[in-house]
Design a protein with these regions (language model features):
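Beta-lactam-recognizing serine transpeptidase/beta-lactamase-like catalytic domain environment
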Residues: 1, 10, 36, 40-81, ...
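Extracytoplasmic/periplasmic proteins that interact with beta-lactams or build/remodel peptidoglycan
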Residues: 1-33, 55-58, 63-67, 237-241, ...
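Short, charged, low-complexity patches
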Residues: 11, 15, 204, 327-340
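Glycine-centered loop/turn motif at secondary-structure junctions
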Residues: 30, 95-96, 160, 347, ...
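Short, small/polar residue-rich loop motifs at catalytic or cofactor-binding pockets
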Residues: 30-34, 104, 220, 422, ...
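Ligand-recognition elements built from short beta-strands and adjacent flexible loops
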Residues: 274, 307, 317-320, 329, ...
Length: 490
């Protein structure tokens, strides 16, 4: 690939949104680390892959060696209750349970071999739908026993566990999955609710994405195309369905069940105004160094997709050892925080009449890993905000965006319900209308980009014209040292 330009599926603005939210939740929760992966359901394209703490590959020596790896593909964790999505999909596909069938949850406990497994709450009888909604371990164990270990193993493999996703990132783990022949008397029950199996974050989001993709397991895609410096196309990577894992009908039924988790179950904090969300929480005990499971350390996670019936984003949020609230509900709130502005940025129209719709958050300008690698060097087309908030008396006052990198300027403009059009690459050196003018929602907002420190409208237009004549710059560029622009205050 020497000398060639690699175009990624990563969207710099979505990466920035994810990194900003993860930094905040790590700071506030005291979590050891946090991860977020956003995927486009129908193609498997990875739109964002963020981890905190992260490191700058230009200055890797400034970070501990443990931060150098891409934990989304190298680190293995027991998923906990998010894995119930896989158990439920297998059970529905095999016809061993129906949504309204009543399941005996044994007053919150069940004997498996010589051990007693308990629920987080005492449940007597729940429908299968409620077993998922309220995340009953006992109920899922009952259902897994109907499947049996051979069929359970078949579906776990079909959803991509126990093998690399082949995303072509270095050191990708295949996870941990023992052959069914070596399962103990408890293994089937444990796997049903996400124990005794090790998965990578990318495996988990890819598996649940199969439900969003109408039953197809899609190969995760990180590279869109490779071009020569002249612009000649060298390689183009198309979406790759790996296999169908469940029928379209099963995927639709699972979607309805997962919508119930967010509407009135353990995942209510994942709700996004104006959109139907489908997803599942997970609260997984971490393994204890002395054996067994820790009583104090947990991995909180949420995986889901939105809009539920016409998905545009599948996302996984993972928080490692947060203090205080260590449940999947905490991860669900981060899911909503990341997904809501992402939907608006992508121009996904709301599907529900929920009164006043939210708009994209006013993301503060921060120096992120994405900005270090690309410095905002991308020529953009216009982006039209799909969601308008309430009318502002007297109109919208145009913000001053001078000095901001492209991604932050776009987020800020959409947050103000303006329609940005960008010319050139780099930082904002000119804008029209000017700052302070009152305009209506949806007004076209021209942002002219150039090198940090450039001034003057004429120079900005010349820079933009030169950029257009020279062609589009790939994102991200090869890592290089770039001085950061001065901090902007707004």
């Amino acid at each position: 690939l020497a000398g060639r330009d690699v175009y990624l599926t990563i969207d710099e603005t979505l990466q920035h949104i994810a990194e900003t939210s993860l930094e905040r939740v790590v700071r506030e929760s005291g979590a050891e680390r946090a991860m977020a992966i956003l995927m486009r359901p129908e193609t498997g394209e990875i739109l964002a892959m963020a981890a905190v703490p992260f490191f700058n590959p230009n200055r890797y020596q400034d970070s501990p060696a443990g931060h150098w790896r891409n934990r989304a593909v190298t680190d293995v964790f027991e998923p906990g209750s998010t894995f119930k999505v896989i158990t439920a999909a297998a059970a529905v596909e095999e016809g061993v349970v129906s949504e309204e069938e009543r399941i005996d949850c044994g007053q919150g406990s069940i004997q498996v071999g010589s051990q007693v497994i308990r629920d987080h709450k005492v449940f007597d009888v729940l429908t299968f739908r409620e077993v998922m909604q309220f995340s009953s371990n006992v109920g899922m164990i009952r259902i897994s026993q109907r499947l049996g270990k051979e069929r359970m193993e078949q579906y776990v493999h079909a959803f991509g566990f126990g093998e690399p996703t082949e995303v072509n990132l270095p050191a990708e783990s295949r996870g941990i999955l023992r052959p069914a022949a070596g399962w103990s008397s408890r293994t089937l029950a444990s796997i049903a609710f996400g124990q005794e199996i090790g998965v990578t974050p990318l495996q988990m989001v890819t598996a649940v994405n199969a439900i969003a993709a109408s039953g197809y397991l899609m190969r995760p895609q990180l590279v869109r195309e490779i071009r020569a410096p002249s612009g000649e196309l060298f390689s183009k990577f198309e979406p790759e369905p790996v296999r169908r894992v469940v029928s379209r009908e099963t995927a639709a039924r699972l979607t309805e069940i997962l919508v119930g988790v967010v509407d009135g179950g353990t995942g209510t904090r994942a709700a996004v105004a104006g959109y139907t969300v489908a997803g599942k929480t997970g609260t997984a005990q971490k393994a204890s160094p002395s054996g067994g499971y820790s009583k104090t350390d947990y991995i909180a996670s949420f995986v889901g997709f939105v809009p539920a019936y016409r998905p545009e984003i599948t996302a996984l949020i993972l928080l490692d050892s947060p203090t205080g609230d260590h449940t999947g509900a905490r991860a669900a709130s981060v899911f909503a925080e990341i997904v809501e502005p992402s939907l608006h940025y992508l121009g996904v129209p709301p599907e529900l009449d929920s009164g006043v719709s939210s708009v994209i958050a006013h993301w503060p300008r921060q120096k992120t890993l994405a900005s270090e690698l690309s410095s905002g060097n991308q020529e953009w087309s216009s982006v039209t905000p799909a969601v308008a908030g309430p009318s502002i008396p007297g109109g919208i006052r145009v913000p001053a965006l001078y000095g901001l990198p492209a991604r932050d300027a776009v987020a800020r403009a959409i947050g103000m319900r303006l329609a940005p059009k960008l010319l050139g690459s780099g930082w904002v050196v000119g804008q029209e209308p000017p700052a302070g003018r009152l305009v209506g929602p949806g007004t076209r907002f021209l942002l002219i980009l150039g090198p940090s420190g450039a001034t003057g409208f004429e120079d900005a237009v010349r820079i933009a014209d030169d950029t257009r004549r020279g062609g589009q710059s790939p994102v991200p560029q090869r890592p290089r040292e770039t001085p950061a622009p001065s901090e902007a205050s707004f």
